[in-house]
From Swiss-Prot:
InterPro entries: 6-PGluconate_DH-like_C_sf, 6PGD_dom2, G3P_DH_NAD-dep, G3P_DH_NAD-dep_C, G3P_DH_NAD-dep_N, NAD(P)-bd_dom_sf. One of its GO terms (biological process) is carbohydrate metabolic process. NADPH binds at residues 15-16, 36, 110, 143, 259, 283, 285. It comes from Salmonella typhimurium (strain LT2 / SGSC1412 / ATCC 700720). It holds the Pfam family NAD_Gly3P_dh_C. This is Glycerol-3-phosphate dehydrogenase [NAD(P)+]. GO terms for cellular component: cytosol. Sn-glycerol 3-phosphate binds at residues 110, 139, 141, 195, 248, 258-260. It catalyses: sn-glycerol 3-phosphate + NAD(+) = dihydroxyacetone phosphate + NADH + H(+); sn-glycerol 3-phosphate + NADP(+) = dihydroxyacetone phosphate + NADPH + H(+). Belongs to the NAD-dependent glycerol-3-phosphate dehydrogenase family. It is an enzyme of class 1 (oxidoreductase).
Length: 339
């Protein structure tokens, strides 16, 4: 591979970043995968697979490992950032001086900015300026299934129509990976953050032992909260019936591959927050997202009772069963009311 002809540079060599890099390379593209830990990258290069997260999926020959950030960013104008939301802004500030003049940025990070609750588009604009094309991909994607080539579909939104078309062409694979372009840049970002919160709640419900009826009710009312917040931010309500909304919500609320769901189940079974986090052993995005989504809802005056009760469990020490009973004990109302 020449130094500047890769189709994509992927920033973040965790399970999801690796899975996306494998998918791109499997499509026949030259892909550079960068990670912040040189030892980890050296191990990936030696093993030619991600033994820790995706041990059964060998790397295609067109997937290249790189520990030098400048070299990785010089390799392609297209940069795919796949890092936890709480380090997103730091990573963008780190890569900005090293990016090519023709660079374009897409992220698969799901969440909001830590502490402020800002959308990641606002973080990216602040860090990178107004000229660089931006895009986001989101949807129901477990890394193991994506890397294994099992059928998957996602949403893609961008500020730039040409960039959206190019990304769809790069990512889309008729055999296993469908990419739908969505014009709603705000909604596609927001869905990925709110679903993390609701997935914790679904896990709590199952951990308590409330059953399938309760889980389904929580998912449905969680979708209502997602749509309500989206409307306040100017998102298209139809987005939340697509891959980045309902699709991702159902996946993470119902399958134990979801760290957020497993975390919630442990809380529902009586484990404390730190103990559950330690047992998961990886970042539980929904833990921070709960605080951020709650902050965003308060800022826009949006009532989100499920999110509020999950916040009370995570940050105020409320018992999960007590939180569930608080929700069940709310005043009677019409299903389609705005509150």
């Amino acid at each position: 591979m020449n130094q500047s002809n890769a189709s994509m540079t992927v920033i973040g060599a965790g399970s999801y970043g690796t899975a996306l890099a494998i998918t791109l390379a499997r499509n026949g593209h030259q892909v550079v995968l960068w990670g912040h830990d040189p030892k980890h990258i050296a191990t990936l290069e030696h093993d030619r697979c991600n033994v820790a997260f995706l041990p059964d999926v060998p790397f295609p020959d067109t997937l290249h490992l790189e520990s030098d950030l400048a070299t990785a960013l010089a390799a392609s104008r297209n940069i795919l950032v796949v890092v936890p939301s709480h380090v997103f802004s730091d990573v963008l500030r780190q890569i900005k001086p090293l990016m090519r003049p023709d660079a374009r940025l897409v992220w698969a990070t799901k969440g909001l900015e830590a502490e402020t609750g800002r959308l990641l588009q606002d973080v990216a604009r602040e860090a990178l300026g107004d000229q660089i094309p931006l895009a986001v991909i989101s949807g129901p994607t477990f890394a193991k299934e994506l890397a294994a080539g099992l059928p998957t579909a996602i949403s893609l939104a961008s500020t730039d129509e040409t960039f959206a078309d190019d990304l769809q062409q790069l990512l889309h694979c008729g055999k296993s990976f469908r990419v739908y372009i969505n014009a709603d840049f705000i909604g596609v970002q927001l869905g990925g953050a709110v679903k993390n919160v609701i997935a914790i709640g679904a896990g709590m419900s199952d951990g308590i032992g409330f059953g399938a009826n309760a889980r389904t009710a929580l998912i449905t009312r969680g979708l209502t909260e997602m749509s309500r917040l989206g409307a306040a931010l100017g998102a298209d309500p139809a987005t939340f019936m697509g891959m980045a909304g309902l699709g991702d919500l159902v996946l993470t609320c119902t399958d134990n591959q979801s760290r957020n769901r497993r975390f919630g189940m442990m809380l529902g079974q009586g484990m404390d927050v730190k103990g559950a986090q330690d047992k998961i052993g990886q970042v539980v995005e929904g833990y921070r997202n709960t605080k951020e989504v709650r902050e965003l809802a308060h800022r826009f005056g949006v009532e989100m009772p499920i999110t509020e009760e999950i916040y009370q469990v995570l940050y105020c020490g409320k018992n999960a069963r007590e939180a569930a009973l608080t929700l069940l004990g709310r005043a009677r109302k019409e299903e389609l009311s705005r509150h």
